[in-house]
A protein has these predicted regions:
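Vicinal oxygen chelate
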Residues: 1-3, 6-15, 43-46, 63-126, ...
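Core segments of cupin and vicinal oxygen chelate
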Residues: 2, 13-52, 56
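Short beta-turn/strand-loop junction motif enriched in small, turn-promoting residues
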Residues: 30, 59, 96-97
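Short histidine-centered beta-strand/loop micro-motifs
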Residues: 34-36, 63-68, 100-102
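Residue-level signature for short turns and capping positions that connect secondary-structure elements
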Residues: 50, 59, 124-126
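A short, acidic/glycine-rich surface segment
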Residues: 55, 59-64
Length: 126
């Protein structure tokens, strides 16, 4: 069996790497990790053990994702009860629309980044 320690990073295609990095840094508190390598692509940002690799897309139009297509559905971040409440307050303050979902075992909020990637913040403490 292959022994894994966890997911190292998730690679996201974005229309503007700098804008996307700034958004994740400002909204979710990520920090710059690795920049300037490989001609600046990708830009790595992260928070704790979570990291994103931001790659520029060559097509500025959003990619249509028909229901049922094989693709990443959303990217979920875990927090505690206090962090979950703070995330909702902060998103409201920033004018970022989100919706709440009670999953019975967890509570989640869903919203989108500037490139349309669906993000989830979830807690198992409620």
């Amino acid at each position: 069996m292959i022994e894994l320690d966890g997911i190292d990073h998730v690679a996201l295609a974005v229309r503007d790497v700098r804008r996307a990095a700034d958004w994740y840094i400002d909204v979710l508190g990520f920090e710059p990790r690795h920049e300037g390598m490989w001609d600046g692509v990708p830009v790595f940002i992260g928070k704790g053990t979570t990291a994103l690799a931001l790659f520029p897309t060559h097509d500025p139009k959003p990619i249509p994702r028909p229901h049922g297509s094989i693709t990443m559905l959303h990217l979920a971040f875990r927090t505690d009860r206090a962090g979950f409440a703070e995330a909702q307050r902060d998103l409201r303050k920033r004018g970022i629309d989100f919706h709440f979902q009670d999953h019975e075992i967890s509570h989640s909020i869903y919203f989108r980044d500037p490139d349309g990637h669906e993000l989830e913040i979830t807690t198992y403490e409620f």
